[in-house]
Amino acid sequence: MMKTEWRGFKGNLWQSEVNLRDFVQNNYTSYDGDESFLAEPTQATNTLWGMLKELQKEERAKGGVLDMETEVVSGLTAYGAAYIGEGTKELEKVVGLQTDKPLKRAFMPYGGIKMAEQACTTYGYQPSEKLHEIFHKYCKTHNDGVFDAYTPEMKLVRHNHILTGLPDTYGRGRIVGDYRRVALYGIDFLIKEKQNDLANMGDREMIDEVIRLREEVSMQIKALKGLKEMAQLYGYDISQPAQNAREAVQWLYFGYLGAVKTQNGAAMSVGRISTFLDIYIQRDLNEGTLTEDEAQELIDHLVMKFRMVKFARIPSYNELFTGDPVWATLEVGGMGQDGRSMVTKNDFRFLHTLENMGPSPEPNLTVLYSSRLPKAFKHYASLISVKTSSIQYENDDVMRPVWGDDYSICCCVSATQTGKEMQFFGARANLAKCLTYAVSGGVDSKTREQCGPKYRAVEGDVLTYDEFMPRFMDMMDWLAGVYVKTLNLIHYMHDKYFYEAAELALIDTDVRRTFATGIAGFSHVVDSISAIKYAKVNIIRDETGFPLSFKTEGDFPRYGNDDERADEIAVWLLKTFMNMIKKHHTYRNSEPTTSILTITSNVVYGKFTSNMPDGRPAGAPLAPGANPSYGAEKNGLLASLNSVAKLPYEYALDGISNTQTISPGALGHNDEERAQTLVGVLDGYFNQGSHHLNVNVFGIDKLKDAMEHPEKEEYQNFTIRVSGYAVKFIDLTREQQLDVIARQAHERL
């Protein structure tokens, strides 16, 4: 019998089992029209957003942190109901804060008490002595477990920054709960389903795997009950399904709020919610119980809450992931497996928040792109890119065959089947440093420690291809091995001491796991191998004979110019490293993947990487993601895109990040013309099978002015795309701002 909350909904399978894809496919309404239906912000939206902008200014004036908790450990019910301001409860169409005040950062010690306390003291807050005693004496954390088990080799590679950004001092993130489930089914049904799962796994042998799973599912059930209690604090009963659009938005947000109250993962993605919510909104519009103004207000207020998510971080984390990113990644667009466009009016509404409330890095709005998407939607998304530089594009046509048509982006660019999968985040291996180890015999140029295996160093003064390649292969093979072993240990400890119960409660118990790894310094390795192969690379040694630098004579092809000689090296490098990763056992039988992605950590990685044969000097930032090296692109934007498009997605299922800055004049004389040109660029790029594109549309002069005059009102929310996410430009360090300015801004296509 259909529940009254499901009135008018079609389909049967989703009613008898948790199956969001079946619900969505049976009930969504495609929209092929343009943006003319969109509504302006309501007075409530303007009032609330105005208050938040003032809080953001105060936060920046205080050094980046407005307020921080020191006495209460964050949890689902650690705080009572809280609102943006006094008397705003009625204005807020979506309610719920992480703590007891807006923009206040929670105290989360389970990832590591030292880090939680350091985050406090960095900004002038004194952590609780009582909590210090509890978590130092009686309660072990993820960070404690990891460092208790690390081998000397693991500590050495970490210390020498050939493995960097490992999730051993912070929450790993990248797990996307299917928050839609709370709205469609209500908590009581979800608890019952998990209880059935628990009951049906008891007949198996009580081996480690079964015992652990029983404990984890029990934790998930407790988390679901905690979510219900949390909602009751705000006066809502989420035990049953949502009855209308407002409840659907609120119920879904409560699911996400539970995640960010209990985890401080590096990526806390929202997932693919737009089409799902449109089903409820469209039903209410048809029934006459909701207007378009009210529908847009709901989405504006939901996005406002995503923009408010904050975590307490330590300085070393901020160096890697600068600008306070949350990766509240949220997808719009995409095609169904049946050939129907999945674009709805709600996809327009989410993009429209960047107009109603201005540009913002969060949520990390991602267009799942196909050239077959409705023309009006492609044009509107491109227009928003031209105006705000706030959204990224990912190729739905290469992801859909792998992940289906109900996947989410769980971090920056990596896909995961919503509610069916989880990912073990793996940071990055510095292949640029690995290349220098191949020459030095595993000795680090900065520390002079024997970090890598003591293989035979290159002895001559000229670095030949035949001498270099076997050494590089051996060194890369070693790095892949220690990389996987280190991640296996980290994720074991994270499951043990910092388990994501609130998120995994909204994912199938029989979960598929992927094991993410990553590559940093990609283009520098490609160009360096090209230099060794096609030019003459002389080794410059110091007084001890250590290979300190290189002098390259002659020309060589560079990746990023649509030159097959360089591009085939890039393809080889990706395939080779991925195959080396695959040779090793991965934790919980997870499926290994890799990415070419750096975030803003390319600056930090570069500091610890010596001179390279491609001409990159010691200490200089590495090129971000899969981008060509700085200054390498000589043949324009399209040639650069063509090079990146040759990298096979099937060997980098964790994602291939490409960030490009285009001068407005290169796209056209006005915004409409620029949007039309950008659609053509996107169609051509993605039809080649490429994976991802960050689009920035501005000139370098604007960046320079923002760097010198961050106080200007126009730059307070000036957002740019960097490798894998968006950030307010003035929130970057000066060093990172200079790095962005140094990148190619294409003046021609």
Whereabouts are the PLM-identified features?
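Conserved catalytic cores of very large enzyme subunits
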Residues: 2-749
